Amino acid sequence: PKPPVVVTPPAPPKPLPQKIRLEIPANVHFALDKSNISARSGEVIKQIAKVLQQHPYIVIDLEGHTDPRASNDYNQRLGLRRAKSTRDYLVRQGIAPERITIRSYGETKLKTPRIDILDHARNRRVEFFYRDIRGIELEIIEQENDLQLEQKRRS
């Protein structure tokens, strides 16, 4: 008689973590009335891209925002240009465009409602919302290393 065939069952899959803590910025900032990526913001986006390359299950929603000092229509378009330039920068860093969605809120979701120069700088931003497509909770840090304050005008 033939010896019995021994089948080794496959190892059970490793359980997914409950939460992933990412040392990853959640926003980048822009100069007054600009949508181009500054050198400092570019460094922030490169840091984000590096983390995203290590975590292929994470997708991103980009939301463009402005300060309140123009018409709502203009600010909607400016917020969208900011979100697009941020997406394009991520794509140039090797992140697949399918992982990124963009939208603009213009001036409708101010980070801070006050009206000094620092508050305006905080409002001129693109926010990153990260989601793990497997449903794992993500813990994210915020940063302001690339705030771009405008120069005070001389009277």
Predicted segment positions?
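Periplasmic OmpA-like peptidoglycan-binding domain that tethers envelope proteins to the cell wall
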Residues: E63-S155
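Periplasmic peptidoglycan-binding/tethering modules of Gram-negative envelope proteins
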Residues: P1-V59, R131-S155
